[in-house]
Amino acid sequence: VAPPLEIAEISPAPLVIMSPRVGVSSAGTDIFPATPPKVSVKLINHMKQSFKGEVAFGFENRSPETRVRVDLSPEQTSTLAVTIPNTEENRAAHLRRPELANSLWFSLRHAGLHENLIKRSVPVVWLDARVAERVNVGFVRGFDFSLPNALNALGVESKELSVDEVKTSDLSTYSSIIVDNRVYESQPELIATNQKLLDYANAGGNLIVFYHRIDEFNPNPQRNRPQLAPYKLILGNERITDENAPISFLEPEHPLLNSPNKLNQGDFKDWIQERGLYYPREWDPQFKALLQSNDPGEAPLKGGLLVADYGKGHYIYTSMVWYRQLRAGVPGAYRMLANMISYGQN
């Protein structure tokens, strides 16, 4: 039986707040990003009468709280967009007691009353990350919203591109373009216009492709699928299923691992489920392999993060499961994403 009122969904969850000075300023100044984070709260009124009240929200065990009035018609579903205020209390919350600022609560109340009719919380991840200036990302989305949520958390300008928009728009306006997980399968019509993506990279853009399966990416004349990468790149069945498998930096000074965030072993802690899938088994020497890892007792795999210069631009292919880590709020995944979309920028 449905409750009379419901906070059905809070998005994004977890809430990732990018704060480049986390843990630096004892006064808590500059703890919030320049653009305060936004959260969507989906409300459902299951009753046959209207409801007038308010949504209150704040960090656990922190004050003050913020209130927003809501007016729900009978049996109405409504999505409320709220902004986490850039107040002195909120800026200082994480620094004073980090363990008490790692959750954000939302409650539905009658107007003017303090009693919670319903209350829900989402975890908060405070992220120490930087993104290059003037980054503008276009992306072709995969099966979920992990990527757009992560780009929003990083505070970068971004736009989801349909295949038609890839085909007809001026791609040079984007500093980076991401082809999300398995997009060549979920939107196979992109294959026919893939050459335009390669031309974008050749002209100076930064093209990033997330993991795909063998039968979605490897050249296959029978399925009219040409080589999708600018150079030879053949995926295999190899995977790393141990989420704690050790990571080696093969080229520790490479810019992709150092700018604008210097990555380290800590960025690969607290991963969930696995490291990567369908690791490349063969690639052109133009590609540089930056990371190496393996399951216990298995041969090392070097194709988890490949990068190549292409014309005036760059091409990155990564078979690592960043989407799972972004969705789980793993800080290192956000720092790596920030480096990928910043690659080639000053």
What is each model feature region?
Residues L100-D180, Y211-N218, K232-I234, R239, ...:
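Aromatic-Pro/Gly-enriched surface loop or interdomain linker
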Residues R182-K269, T318, A338:
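A glycine-rich, often tryptophan-bearing local segment used as a flexible ligand/cofactor-contacting loop or short
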Residues V1, V55-F57, N90-H114:
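Short, aromatic- and glycine-rich surface loops/edge beta-strands on solvent-exposed regions
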Residues R62-N90:
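Intrinsically disordered, low-complexity Pro/Gly/Ser/Thr-rich segments with frequent PxxP/GP/PP motifs
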Residues K48-G53:
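Short acidic/proline- and small/hydrophobic-mixed sequence motifs that coincide with surface turns
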Residues N237-V330, R335, Q345:
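Catalytic beta-strand/loop cores that center a nucleophilic Ser/Cys/Thr
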